[in-house]
Amino acid sequence: MRVVRLAVAIITLLAMPACVPLASMNPLWDDAHMISEPALTGSWVSDSGDAILTVAELSGGRYRLTYVADDSASQYEVHTVRLEDQLYLDVYPDSDWIEKRLNGEAFQSLVLTHFFLRVVLEEDRLELAVMDDEALEKKLEQEGLDVPLLSWKDGLLLAASTDQVQKLVVHFADDPEVWGEPEAFHLCRAR
């Protein structure tokens, strides 16, 4: 039962508006592109009011993101990445949090993957868009781009190196079909 609740919490964040995020074996971030973005820290409430993101900085460019929606929570390690002029989040499940939730049950058999969010951050407003696996696959076919993707029953897995992942993300940086509809949040200020 714990595995089911954990899966529901993770799927809740991954399903942000309605697309399946592209899972990646390798990260988007590297030392050359990871940045600190202090404006991300704090508690963010979705414009719909049904989700809360809490972002706490761990160290230069690394954050802990807690996502709460529908009476379930999930926790992630996040790296902020700037590629050209665009900000992204590389989101990776917090392995300590997962292990605690599962009490060690079947933890070793889980394959944790990265997924990517395109970020628009303006003062007290945050928009996050997920890279959609099916939309990306269609675009790759249309453009004849050779990118290592593995199919599995729940979606696609990007098997590219970090350098290739960065080039792919930059190539589709402004494509709204690949990124899907962003979910908007506003910063919750203490009164």
What are these regions (language model features)?
Residues 1-7:
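Bacterial N-terminal signal peptides that target proteins for export
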Residues 15-18:
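C-terminal motif of bacterial Sec signal peptides marking the signal peptidase cleavage site
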Residues 20-38, 47-52, 56-191:
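Calycin-type beta-barrel ligand-binding domains and close structural analogs
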